[in-house]
């Protein structure tokens, strides 16, 4: 199936679920997601980002930025194309750039280099949910740089204003078993927000970080990745004793030696494409011992190898 057909096929996949799946808690559906979701456009004109070790920021140069851009980009598709493809979970890190966005609060996305202002991405997400009123998105903002409490409050205010009335209320307002596709569609809720900072506990529309787990293998070895993944899946109930969303990260993490050794190449060509292909094969094996523990699955370069369709179809197994 080509990308255009996949986008058309999966664009409203939650709307098109049969009722028995719409009545299952979201924590027990198979949901495709993207790793470093908004790294498709990294800006080589801005300095090296704050999430990179200081030693590299000291040797900032056009050559260094080009190398980081090739290895920091984990997605090719922009947010709208990912949404049309069927992605419903987004993994996000943000930074405040003093001098760049102090007045407009254009908080930037980043992964090695700075990307777009997050306001642009949020506007695209808002447009999508208005045009697709039965789709539900999970936004997981999990890394913050150069933030203080005042900036957190301003940013949360921006989110609350933009998505007003669309947030799925967080526990204890609802129990996990109440949060289904059907429930969200009946009430017009379309966004489940994780904002992994303690201050977020003051806001009723933000889900606490205790309701999501995203274990990271932190390996550049594909055999170690699958060993870790299968082990950690069977530990889901211990990791989330009160239940919650579980993210399976089917990704490899390059070391600096990997990057130096292949500096003219990219994450996609050296590691990510092969890993996403293996992830799809692993999912298609449909291991009956592991499938009950799967929930959200994320990869790099989500357009490859029918990843989204493969995950969505697991709901019907």
What are the language-model segments listed below?
Residues 1-85, 89, 98-131, 136, ...:
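Long, acidic (Asp/Glu-rich), low-complexity accessory segments flanking structured domains
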Residues 93:
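A motif-centric signal for short, conserved binding hotspots located
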Residues 186-270:
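Aromatic-lined glycan-binding groove of carbohydrate-active enzymes
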Residues 110-169, 189, 297:
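Intrinsically disordered, low-complexity acidic segments that are enriched in bulky aromatics
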Residues 99-105, 151, 172-186, 202-203, ...:
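Intrinsically disordered, low-complexity coil segments
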Residues 72-77, 118-124, 165-185, 218-238, ...:
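A Trp-anchored, charged/polar loop motif used as the substrate-binding/catalytic surface
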């Amino acid at each position: 199936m080509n990308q255009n057909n996949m986008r058309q096929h999966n664009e409203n996949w939650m709307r098109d679920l049969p009722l028995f799946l719409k009545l299952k808690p979201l924590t027990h559906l198979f949901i495709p997601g993207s790793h470093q979701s908004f790294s498709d456009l990294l800006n080589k004109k801005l300095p090296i980002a704050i999430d990179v070790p200081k030693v590299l920021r000291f040797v900032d140069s056009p050559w260094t930025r080009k190398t980081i851009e090739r290895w920091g980009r984990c997605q090719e598709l922009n947010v709208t194309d990912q949404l049309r493809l069927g992605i419903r979970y987004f993994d996000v890190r943000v930074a405040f750039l003093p001098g760049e966005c102090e007045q407009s609060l254009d908080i930037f996305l980043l992964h090695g280099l700075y990307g777009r202002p997050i306001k642009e991405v949020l506007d695209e997400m808002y447009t999508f949910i208005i045009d697709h009123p039965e789709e539900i998105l999970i936004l997981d903002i999990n890394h913050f740089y150069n933030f203080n409490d005042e900036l957190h409050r301003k940013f949360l205010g921006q989110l609350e204003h933009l998505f007003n009335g669309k947030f799925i209320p967080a526990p204890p307002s609802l129990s996990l078993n109440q949060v289904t596709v059907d429930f969200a569609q009946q009430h017009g809720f379309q966004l489940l927000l994780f904002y992994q900072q303690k201050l977020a506990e003051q806001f009723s529309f933000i889900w606490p970080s205790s309701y999501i787990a995203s274990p990271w293998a932190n390996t550049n070895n594909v055999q170690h990745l699958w060993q870790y993944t299968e082990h950690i899946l069977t530990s889901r109930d211990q990791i989330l004793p009160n239940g919650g969303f579980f993210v399976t990260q089917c990704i490899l993490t390059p070391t600096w030696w990997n990057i130096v050794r292949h500096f003219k190449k990219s994450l996609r060509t050296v590691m990510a494409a092969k890993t996403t292909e293996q992830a799809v094969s692993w999912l298609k094996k449909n291991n009956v011992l592991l499938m009950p523990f799967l929930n959200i699955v994320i990869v790099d370069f989500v357009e490859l190898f029918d990843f989204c369709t493969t995950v969505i179809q697991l709901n019907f197994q």
